[in-house]
Amino acid sequence: MIPEGPASCFIIQNGYFCSKMRVLIISTYDLQGGAAIAAYRLMHALRKAGCDASMAVRTRLSDDPKVVQVGSEAMNRLHFYRERGSIFLHNRLSRENLFDVSIANSGVSITSLPEFKAADVIHLHWINQGMLSLTEIERILASGKKVVWTLHDVWAFTGICHHAAGCRHYEQACGNCPYLAAPSPRDLSYRGFLKKQITYA
C-alpha cells in the first residue's frame, strides 16, 4: 500500500511502499551565500513534503540538527588553504582571480559518513573551496547512489572557472585560460578539464 503524500518522497518497489526517500544534500555552507541558502531551503521543503532530508556542509552556521558539519575546523581550513595556495602559486603569487577559479585538489570525505551510507539520493550543490575534491566526487559517483547536481555556476563543466565571462574554451578542452597569469594550451584549466572528464566517466 502506498501512503498518501508526494510519491516522489517514497521509495516504491514492485508497487509496494518501502520507506521514505533519504536525501543527503551536500554544500560548502548551510547559510552563507545564495547557493547555500537555496540548498538549505530545499532541505526543509523536502522534509515538509515527507522526505528524510539532511545536509552535510564544510561550514555550519545554523544550529539545525539536520545539518552536519563534516571534518574539524582545523582540517577544513587546511583543505581551503591548500587549494587557494596551489592557485596562488600557479598564478605567479598573484591574488587576482584567486576566487574566480577552483581546482578541487583537496576536500573532506563524504563517502565515509553514516548519513552518506544511509542516503538513497546524494544531491550536490555548490561544493568548492575545500569542500569536495575531484577525487571525492569520483568516489561519490562510483558509490552506486543516485546523484543529482544542481549547478549554481559553470564550474562543473569548465576546467577551473566559476563564470566563463564570455570564454568558450570549455566547449573543447579549456586551456589558454583568461583567469590565469600565464595561460597556455595545457595550463591549469586544461588539466582540470581532463581530470573532470576522467572523474565523470
Walk through the language-model features, giving the residues of each.
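Acidic, Ala/Val/Gly-enriched low-complexity intrinsically disordered segments
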Residues: 4-7
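Catalytic cores of nucleotide-sugar-dependent glycosyltransferases that transfer UDP/GDP/TDP-activated
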Residues: 21-201
